[in-house]
Structures are given as C-alpha cells and as structure tokens.
C-alpha cells in the first residue's frame, strides 16, 4: 500500500507533466505530508522545468499552488480532513543530486562530494551525459588549500563518482563589481552583507 506521500505524488505528477498547463514551466521536486493536530500539512517543492539556470518567480509559485490545490481537492486523496498547503521553490541549500540540478547550477560555486569521501570546490562550467565539467577554485577544502597549479584547472567529475553537490553562497562572484550588484534587483542582500563587512573592517582599523 503506498504511503500518503506517494499517493499525493501520484496525484500531482500529471499536473506537472510535459504538455500540461504548467508542466512546460515547472517541475515537481518533492512532496511530503505531515500531521499538525487535526490538520494535515502538505509541502510541495517545485522548480523551473528544464536545465537552464535561473530563479523561480513568485507568480510561478502562485500558479503552482493553485494547480496543486485544485488537483488535491478533485482527487480526494487527503480525505475529508482539513489540510494546509505549502508550495515553495528549492532553497540554496537543496543538494544537487540529478543532472538537471547540476545543469541549473552552471556558473555557480559548488562543493562536490565524491564517493571516495573527498570534497572539491568547483565552478560548474557545463554538464553532459558523462558528468560535470568545471574548474577548481582556491577556497579551502578540509582546511587545506588546493595547490596553486590546480587553481582554475579544468576538473571533470563523472556521474558515478558524484554523491551530491552543495551550492556555496558568494558575496561577490568573479569579475562582478559592486556596480554590477546594484544593477541586479535581487542583489540587495549581498550589498547589505558587503556594507557590514566594510564597517567591521573600519572598526578594526580604528581600534589599532
């Protein structure tokens, strides 16, 4: 007998299928159903369909929420009990576990965890059937910096050798100036962090 999570996933899969109203733009990532008192809480994670980098906008999440709610109500999979629906996009801490995840992370700094227990920091350049292709980055890994000759060197990671990837938060990406961040409407948080760091540096100089 399928679990409730599996039953809800079965109901929602056609909603996000290719050719459906929202299936061309959105993909179903995860479904979980929990109980909170007398209510059930249905959490649905959706992402942009396809493998192109980019963020999911609020209008798309709202459209997904409407479609999911209608499908759940029509199916009766949750019975007569009231439920709360939460539809969201994956957070930056979502592990990269599929080729589509990795492809959508092109250009990002990622900590790649390998099957031999080691981890590497790579800038993802491209993704194909063979695996992930990137360049090594100079950040510390397990307390040891990579050798100078390896920094920026191409690194290919086969799918069989990859366990997961973890996207790293960057205050300023390579070649990106503060002026570039200002031009980006979504960069306000990054600018705030940069200002705070500058204030801390100024305070240290005053104390000296």
From Swiss-Prot:
One Pfam short name: RimP_N
Main subcellular location: cytoplasm
Region (Disordered) location: 175-208
BP GO annotations: ribosomal small subunit assembly; translation
GO cellular component, one term: cytosol
Acidic residues biased stretches: 177-208
Location(s) in or outside the cell: Cytoplasm
Domain of life: Bacteria
Keywords from the UniProt entry: Cytoplasm, Ribosome biogenesis
Family designation: Belongs to the RimP family.
Primary role: Required for maturation of 30S ribosomal subunits.
Name of the molecule in the record: Ribosome maturation factor RimP
């Amino acid at each position: 007998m399928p679990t409730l999570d599996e039953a809800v996933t079965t109901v929602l899969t056609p909603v996000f299928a290719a050719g459906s109203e929202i299936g061309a733009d959105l993909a179903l990532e995860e479904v979980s159903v929990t109980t909170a008192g007398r209510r059930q809480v249905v959490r649905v994670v959706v992402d942009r369909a396809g493998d192109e980098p980019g963020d999911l906008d609020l209008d798309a999440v709202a459209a997904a929420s409407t479609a999911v709610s209608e499908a759940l109500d029509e199916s009766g999979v949750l019975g007569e009990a009231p439920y709360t629906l939460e539809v969201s996009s994956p957070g930056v801490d979502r592990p990269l576990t599929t080729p589509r995840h990795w492809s959508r992370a092109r250009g990002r700094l990622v900590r790649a965890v390998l099957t031999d227990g080691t981890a590497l920091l790579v800038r993802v350049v491209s993704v194909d059937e063979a695996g992930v292709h990137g360049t090594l980055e100079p950040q510390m890994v397990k307390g040891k910096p990579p050798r100078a000759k390896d920094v920026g060197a191409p690194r290919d990671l086969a799918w069989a050798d990859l366990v997961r990837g973890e996207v790293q938060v960057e205050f300023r990406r390579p070649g990106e100036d503060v002026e570039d961040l200002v031009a980006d409407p979504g960069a306000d948080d990054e600018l705030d962090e940069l200002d705070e760091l500058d204030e801390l540096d100024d305070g240290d100089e005053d104390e000296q």
